[in-house]
Amino acid sequence: THLASLYHDDVMDSAPTRRGVPSAQHLWGNNRAILAGDILFARASLLVASLGPEMVAHHARTFERLCEGQLNETFGPTDGADRVDFYLQVLADKTGSLVSTAASFGALLSGAGSLMAGIVADFGEKVGVAFQIADDVLDLASSGQQSGKTPGTDLREGVDTLPVLLLRRREAAGTIDEAGA
């Protein structure tokens, strides 16, 4: 599911590279990259189906959250919404849900029980959000050789990430000095 979501994300972001190599959409075009992502989603679903109906439902809810997060990111926050809270919810839905599900699957399949699965799911979501924040900082602060991606992709695509949102918040409050710090 994660790899499939990356194929789709690269189409949405018009990203030419992923992990230091040309992205699927760059190599094959948008239509083929989307279809390849769909095939990967289907294969992941087949694997999860062998785990039983409870896991299939959990996987489906994760896929739904992932898509809702992408839609919300695409549409942006409603008027008056806190943009940082909105951003963090998008991260929780897109990246956090995937890590959360992987963690809860591990707990459930190891026999740890639903209480422990819930605890590791919550932790996994936080890890996913933290990972995405770090990735967003790298998009601004690292070279393509370091990150394996084209720097500044989010800025070019008009996606407000946490560093940009916090800078705008400071600008609105008048707390940025002449050097921009």
Language model region names:
Residues 1-177:
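Mg2+-dependent prenyl diphosphate-binding active-site environment of isoprenoid biosynthetic enzymes
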